[in-house]
Amino acid sequence: MADQPERNPNSQPVELNRTSLYLGLLLVFVVGLLFSSYFLN
């Protein structure tokens, strides 16, 4: 039943997971940099 909604569990989940991870890391880095700059200012 878990294979019905996802027909291609070979490219979609992997790509989505990778994109999500990279986006999350980038967001955290940007937020940290902005916060640091704001505090330093």
Curated annotation (Swiss-Prot):
<keyword id="KW-0674">Reaction center</keyword>
<keyword id="KW-1133">Transmembrane helix</keyword>
<feature type="transmembrane region" description="Helical">
    <location>
        <begin position="20"/>
        <end position="40"/>
    </location>
</feature>
<comment type="function">
    <text>One of the components of the core complex of photosystem II (PSII). PSII is a light-driven water:plastoquinone oxidoreductase that uses light energy to abstract electrons from H(2)O, generating O(2) and a proton gradient subsequently used for ATP formation. It consists of a core antenna complex that captures photons, and an electron transfer chain that converts photonic excitation into a charge separation. This subunit is found at the monomer-monomer interface and is required for correct PSII assembly and/or dimerization.</text>
</comment>
<keyword id="KW-0472">Membrane</keyword>
<keyword id="KW-0602">Photosynthesis</keyword>
<dbReference type="Pfam" id="PF02419">
    <property type="entry name" value="PsbL"/>
</dbReference>
<keyword id="KW-0812">Transmembrane</keyword>
<protein>
    <recommendedName>
        <fullName>Photosystem II reaction center protein L</fullName>
    </recommendedName>
</protein>
<dbReference type="GO" id="GO:0009539">
    <property type="term" value="C:photosystem II reaction center"/>
</dbReference>
<keyword id="KW-0793">Thylakoid</keyword>
<comment type="similarity">
    <text>Belongs to the PsbL family.</text>
</comment>
<dbReference type="InterPro" id="IPR003372">
    <property type="entry name" value="PSII_PsbL"/>
</dbReference>
<dbReference type="InterPro" id="IPR037266">
    <property type="entry name" value="PSII_PsbL_sf"/>
</dbReference>
<keyword id="KW-0604">Photosystem II</keyword>
<comment type="subunit">
    <text>PSII is composed of 1 copy each of membrane proteins PsbA, PsbB, PsbC, PsbD, PsbE, PsbF, PsbH, PsbI, PsbJ, PsbK, PsbL, PsbM, PsbT, PsbX, PsbY, PsbZ, Psb30/Ycf12, peripheral proteins PsbO, CyanoQ (PsbQ), PsbU, PsbV and a large number of cofactors. It forms dimeric complexes.</text>
</comment>
<dbReference type="GO" id="GO:0031676">
    <property type="term" value="C:plasma membrane-derived thylakoid membrane"/>
</dbReference>
<dbReference type="GO" id="GO:0015979">
    <property type="term" value="P:photosynthesis"/>
</dbReference>
